Amino acid sequence: MTSLQEKMDRAGGALEMLRTSPIGQYVFPVAPEFSNWRDEQEAWTRSAVLLDQSHHMTDLYIEGLDTIRLFADFGINNFRTFRRNKAKQFVACNHDGHVIGDAILFGLDDFRVNLVGRPHVPNWIQYNALNWGYDVVVERDERSLDNGRGRRSYRFEVQGPNAWALLEKLNGGPIDDIRFFSMGQITIAGRRVRALKHGMAAAPGLELWGPAPEAEEVRAAILEAGRDLGLVQGGGRAYSTASTESGWFASVLPAIYNDPKLAGYREWLPAASFEGNASLGGSYVSDRIEDYYVTPWDCGYDFVDFDHEFVGRDALLARRDEPRLRKVTLVWDIEDVVAIFRSQFEEGDARCKFMEAPAAYYATFPFDAVMLNGERIGFSTYVVYSSNLRRWISLALIDERHAQTGGEVEVIWGEPDGGTRRPLVERHRQAIVRARIAPSPVEAHVREGYRPQSARPASPPRVPA
């Protein structure tokens, strides 16, 4: 068994392969905690946090005269002004207009870029670069889990209200003006460090990278400079929650498993690829894998550029006026969550699916059904506990007709029929969790009005009818 297609065929289809995979949530191979994940989460809203992104993403370097043409042919983005020191959230679709994935595209030079993200988007671009005659050279630096040689670059992120003061302290003075999602350079410990400007918690920060041999020198300088500014190192447990709080879909299910036009791609992908090992879990169950696919608009990617030809353009044009899903945050009801934890003391299979803190999702692609008046209106994903909000929250894509802020919906937590036989899923029963719709990204004030009601009697988890 060598290819993804062969693995799918042996499993009885893509859905069966994904639902029986023993793999859990995506791995961030750094220290789980440096202090404790609660303080590490709160640092990105109260002081500053240093996050190590050196290990969990794949880097795909592409250089050559056709570099921009390659990405324009396979991306929904506008590339007319893309050049050195620019960056984009690159989004690729299949021929039906469903999202394969997104990754960050860094303009290293006018004809040299670096595509950084989970492996599936680099896989897709590499396949097309090599198979359709583009005048480019491709170099791949695998994520640490797939890389026995070590990474060629480090990648750090400094974010939070005190981040800019810390970065200017490291730089020895004001940082040259870097526009949002553009790139520049700063100096750290005498080293020239490239930087991308973006932000968390409504405060500016920088993503920093350079040669891997300089990583520990740069890290030590950042930690020393941040000593008086409340800098905290963030570990893998805190990092796994950041995307939900900031309103970013860490990964959609890649829309590559059934498109007949992608048969050659599935034959090219190894059976042990990210796409072949990934898992699907949760209460949102369908026999059609297309029901797990999303469009760019569903995810809030409103920057589709129809003024150029790209894979998926015609399908998206035809679907432009169709009803859409809307990305929201769901704030889970406190008492319903408490009831789930209370059920852990019940005998046998009477307990609910355990909610691991701070990230309770237990599959690479978590999908839980969102219900309104008995009708499924979308799905919830990446449920986490936020110490900043003191709430359990999740991202969700729901029918835009029902996506009003403040509205109440229900999430079905846990899998049907006692759970799948994946080793990470204990036998359990499903529970219904009420949730309030909030903006995405979530705002700090949403917790007002959702405080615990101490007079409310304890009750067992409700189960789906």
Region locations from a protein language model:
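Acidic, proline/glycine-enriched N-terminal capping motif
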Residues: 1-89, 93, 98-100, 327
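Conserved, structured C-terminal
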Residues: 1-27, 32, 107-465
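Short, surface-exposed charged micro-motifs
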Residues: 102-105
